[in-house]
Amino acid sequence: MAKKKAFTPLFYLASIVFLPWWISFSVNKCLESWVTNWWNTGQSEIFLNNIQEKSLLEKFIELEELLLLDEMIKEYSETHLEEFGIGIHKETIQLIKIQNENRIHTILHFSTNIICFIILSGYSILGNEKLVILNSWAQEFLYNLSDTVKAFSILLLTDLCIGFHSPHGWELMIGSIYKDFGFVHNDQIISGLVSTFPVILDTIFKYWIFRYLNRLSPSLVVIYHSMND
């Protein structure tokens, strides 16, 4: 019985690691056909924001220039001019299809992530007792570590998250989240988040050291500052 009770939190921990991927994959597959059918049959217009309009216009201009250059190399005749118009028409339709698929991708991924968040939130609430056990194990493990190891771990974690080289990692992570939710890549928003989020984390961390860690283990704070200097 004791082994079973000890194994249950470990199984719950493993499920927390692998369940999000499985839920995301399953929900995505279930919604894919429905979202595609709804968008293709229920939407009479294509909705584009300024960034998408600019991107589509740039692609169209680039395509037109390439086709025009190709026709300039050939002899000018009515047949070639007709073929040029047909080529522009076909490629324009192809660009619209690609844009339509991108919109379906955006709706699908956003809906999938919202549903996954709701399911995982409910799963966490139902497994609150197991989370308490895992938390007690983690606290016991950290308590048994020496102050030097704790200080080194804190220093390593802070350097990775809010160090001078961390903006590159934040840029990749935020860009990945943007892509996962199906949002259009926006350099201005990503740059703004990269420049502000680590600063906020750094402020919170310093406040945590001042209010909590300094009271809990003054020797750990001394070692941390010595290693940091």
Curated annotation (Swiss-Prot):
The lineage of its organism: Eukaryota, Viridiplantae, Streptophyta, Embryophyta, Tracheophyta. Belongs to the CemA family. Keywords: Antiport, Chloroplast, Hydrogen ion transport, Ion transport, Membrane, Plastid, Plastid inner membrane, Potassium, Potassium transport, Transmembrane, Transmembrane helix, Transport. It is found in: Plastid, Chloroplast inner membrane. It holds the Pfam family CemA. The keyword Isomerase does not apply. The chain crosses the membrane at residues 7-27, 107-127, 189-209. Contributes to K(+)/H(+) antiport activity by supporting proton efflux to control proton extrusion and homeostasis in chloroplasts in a light-dependent manner to modulate photosynthesis. Prevents excessive induction of non-photochemical quenching (NPQ) under continuous-light conditions. Indirectly promotes efficient inorganic carbon uptake into chloroplasts. GO terms for biological process: potassium ion transport. One of its GO terms (molecular function) is antiporter activity. The keyword Transcription regulation does not apply. InterPro entries: CemA (IPR004282). This is Potassium/proton antiporter CemA. One of its GO terms (cellular component) is chloroplast inner membrane. It comes from Atropa belladonna (Belladonna). It is a multi-pass membrane protein. It catalyses: K(+)(in) + H(+)(out) = K(+)(out) + H(+)(in). Its main location: plastid.
